[in-house]
From Swiss-Prot:
Pfam families: LYTB (PF02401), S1 (PF00575). The active site is at E131. SUPFAM superfamilies: Nucleic acid-binding proteins. The gene is ispH. This is 4-hydroxy-3-methylbut-2-enyl diphosphate reductase. Keywords: 4Fe-4S, Iron, Iron-sulfur, Isoprene biosynthesis, Metal-binding, Oxidoreductase. Its EC number is 1.17.7.4.
Amino acid sequence: MEIIRAKHMGFCFGVLEAINVCNSLVEEKGRKYILGMLVHNKQVVEDMERKGFKLVTEDELLNDMDELKEDDIVVIRAHGTSKSVHEKLKERKVKVFDATCIFVNKIRQEIEIANENGYSILFMGDKNHPEVKGVISFADDIQIFESFEEAKKLKIDLDKTYLLSTQTTLNKKKFEEIKKYFKENYKNVVIFDKICGATAVRQKAVEDLAVKVEVMIIVGDTKSSNTKKLYEISKKLNDNSYLVENEEQLDLSIFRGKEVVGITAGASTPEETIMNIEKKVRGIYKMSNVNENQNEFSLMLEEFLPNQEKRVEGVIESMDQNFSYLDVPGERTAVRVRTDELKDYKVGDTVEVLITGLSEEDDDQEYITASRRKIEVEKNWEKIEDSFKNKTILDAKVTKKIKGGYLVEAFLYPGFLPNSLSEISDSEEKVNGKKIQVIVKDIKMDPKDKKNRKITYSVKDIRLAEQEKEFAGLAVGQIVDCVVTEVLDFGLAVDINTLKGFIHISEVSWKRLDKLSDNYKVGDKIKAVVVSLDEAKRNVKLSIKKLEEDPWATVANEFKVDDEIEGIVTKVLPYGAFVEIKPGVEGLVHISDFSWTKKKVNVADYVKEREKIKVRITDLHPEDRKLKLGIKQLVANPWETAEKDFAIDTVIKGKVVEVKPFGIFVEIADGIDAFVHSSDYNWVGEEIPKFEIGNEVELKITELDLNNKKIKGSLKALRKSPWEHAMEEYKVGTTVEKKIKTVADFGLFIELIKGIDGFIPTQFASKEFIKNIRDKFSEGDVVKAQVVEVNKETQKIKLSIKKIEIEEEKREEREQIEKYSTSSSEE
């Protein structure tokens, strides 16, 4: 069976450093506490408990704070802790060893700095995770969310500036989606992306491996956030993915019939656990408690510091590339020393050496072996002790990079230089042979063998000592020389000799600087003034702009509300434009202050960056450094005269500026539109007009709403309606002959003019009784009827056939009467 390890897996340097911190404290006096789980791994935690550490929660520590003594030790876990715990520990003056991961510390520091400088914080992470609980306690104004859906629901104030940050162990792909959303939708959100590099590469490594193997094993504590994320990623790509804490949880049946197995592990998983998993898979599982680093270190000590045997003096008789041979009185054979130990000697010189034994059996000739190096090592011990006691600086050389740090040699004394004390960058590749300066941090001797000395070196302590000296020499208001080390979105990180300083973007210039990288680069030498000093954190905050006079100091004397002035546009944003009215003094023209009449304003249509424009001051508060400007205030508000200019029934011409399916908008004055609904285009029966933008039209004002600044107009109101025409033509008594348009159960409809029908009720359709009107009339029949009623309110005209018939009948009767009357007279 082939077992393939992920390219990146297991202990990250943050976890390793936390474990190294605890291991270095095992022999210290006093009670030893670890705040929370040192790392999310039961085996590591249990190992620490066996070594004398007691695990306590934050609540337990705070409750028992009064019982802590000055020689007690508290180790802060890799995930960090809350601000209140830090402050309480500082008050108690106990020995605190902060093993917080540097990525977590970096995020915490950036959030704290940003919050102090007025930024609101947006933080993505699991609010119940100990890392998140600790980090967010350092900010007052903060919103927490866990998903893209929650991010979209956040309340973002466009007048505020935000810092977006994240939990270090978050899924990098998820945060990339969040970053993209905020970049595309908000210009006032600064993104601080510090997902742990170890987390990101481990997630990428498991993605690459999961698709290449038949079974994927993820090793780690089930409570570990980064371990669970590795499992989730693997499970999506390979359904045969299993999360186990140790070899005891491993079910060998899952490997039945499988040939290729992949293994990865969380950042808190020991190498021993991973190896035990591998051994069980191969069927050769057995426990191993080898400490790789310690063995390597011990072997090196044995190589250079064997038990002393005998010192002798001899004359160098010959030297070759590998060995030199000495004549030592009293010895039965030549004494052989490695030539590289006698670089400062030549043939004929007398030299003192230490006898170490006999040459190997396979040598052609037997020699007594000796060492000059070990003599020199003993002579240099005073320098090592002096460095330990008085912190004197030693020249040293890196001999090898090992897990957790480096093997270093100073005055022939090898020792261990932990990563946390090395000041050597992780990205630095060629470190073997690197010359450095160190001090001795610690010496441990074996009581049974005083030659077995374990030395811990430190580079960091040299810097801290120099920093302490330099920090003591600083004062608020002092001008210092700095070198830019990092250009961030919200400030400049600088070096002041050995000290670190920070210049927030708001302290760089009195002028607006949206992108510091346009003005500064790494390596720039600048001057700045010290504005605050934090002795506890060795933090130095500086200002460049305070080297010059505050331009706001004279604003009250130079400007007042209602002044019309010229300025330069410095920034165009969706919600307005910033205009500089003098160097270092800016005001905002809000989007609502560009036009009296336009409801939808595109700021970029009005102004461009670096353009000189005229503005009016609408609000000014120099003490708060607030200035509001307006462009529309330069001209009169046309709505103030709208009641007179656009009174109801006013006929006015304008141009079509927008065509919608439901109507048109007509500009009747600069920036003032009237809306004409499609139902007001034409009367029934008239041709429906078509409009294009730019068409000139005439309309009549039908509605004026000054409160909501709305005007409605009508095109058809310019002409008489069909009803008005009908009223003029069809008065009561008018007789018409028209075709029947519709036959209904209750009467007849005839079209008088296009769009206006007349109605003949059934009872008016004939003088005779009509049982079924459809039997008597059909659509298309021409009938003669008389208008009997015109109702203006309902706009209805009623007619009668019956009245015509009765009148005709009466006329015929009169004619007959007249006829017979005439005949009788003649007779």
